[in-house]
Design a protein with these regions (language model features):
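Short beta->alpha connector loops at strand-helix junctions that form conserved
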Residues: 43, 92-93
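The conserved SAM/SAH-binding core of class I Rossmann-like methyltransferase domains
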Residues: 71, 89-91
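Short acidic-hydrophobic, aromatic-tinged amphipathic segments that line or gate anion-handling sites
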Residues: 108-112
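Substrate-recognition "cap/lid" segment bordering the active-site pocket of phosphatases
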Residues: 13, 19-70, 75-84, 98-102
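Catalytic-core regions built around general acid/base machinery
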Residues: 1-9
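Flexible glycine-rich beta->alpha loop in the catalytic core of nucleotide-sugar glycosyltransferases
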Residues: 87, 94-96
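Short amphipathic alpha-helix with an adjacent loop that forms part of the alpha/beta core around
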Residues: 118-124
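Short phosphate-binding/catalytic loops that engage adenosine nucleotides
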Residues: 10, 86, 106
Length: 124
C-alpha cells in the first residue's frame, strides 16, 4: 500500500511519539526508511496532540494543511490533526478503542488495512 501511494505521487510522512533513534531502528528493521518523504519524532518537537509535528511536516513537504490527512490509531493522533486543521482518519486496529477515536470526528474509520487502502485510493 505504501509503495503504491508513493508511486501515485502522494507524500508519505511519519509523526511519532518515538525518539529519532527508535523510529529509525523500526523503519530500518522493516526496510521502510526510504519509503517516507519526511518524519518527525517527539524528541524533535512538541508531542501530540500539539499540532507542531504535522505543521512542520506539511511545511517541509510544501503542502497545504487542508490537503493533509493524518492516519492514526490514538486520540492523540486525531486531535493533532484537528488542532492543525488537517483531516483525520481513524484505524480500528491500534491502540485506542473505536468509540474514543470516533469522539475526535475522523473523516473515515478503517476496520483494517485493505479498507484503509481502498478508501485512500478512492478519496485521497
Amino acid at each position: 500500500m505504501l509503495e503504491e501511494l508513493s508511486q501515485l505521487g502522494y507524500f508519505l510522512a511519519v509523526a511519532t511519539g518515538k525518539s529519532r533513534v527508535g523510529l529509525n531502528r523500526a523503519l530500518n528493521a522493516c526496510g521502510l526508511l526510504s519509503t517516507f518523504d519526511a518524519t518527525r519524532c517527539a524528541d524533535e518537537t512538541f508531542s501530540k496532540p500539539h499540532p507542531a509535528m504535522l505543521q512542520e511536516l506539511t511545511r517541509e513537504l510544501g503542502q497545504d494543511m487542508r490537503r493533509t490527512v493524518m492516519i492514526g490509531d490514538t486520540t492523540h493522533d486525531l486531535l493533532m490533526a484537528n488542532n492543525a486543521g488537517a483531516s483525520g482518519i481513524a484505524v480500528e486496529y491500534g491502540a485506542h478503542p473505536v468509540q474514543q477515536l470516533q469522539a475526535c470526528h475522523p473523516i473515515f474509520t478503517a476496520k483494517n488495512v485493505p479498507e484503509l487502502h481502498q478508501w485512500l485510493i478512492e478519496n485521497a
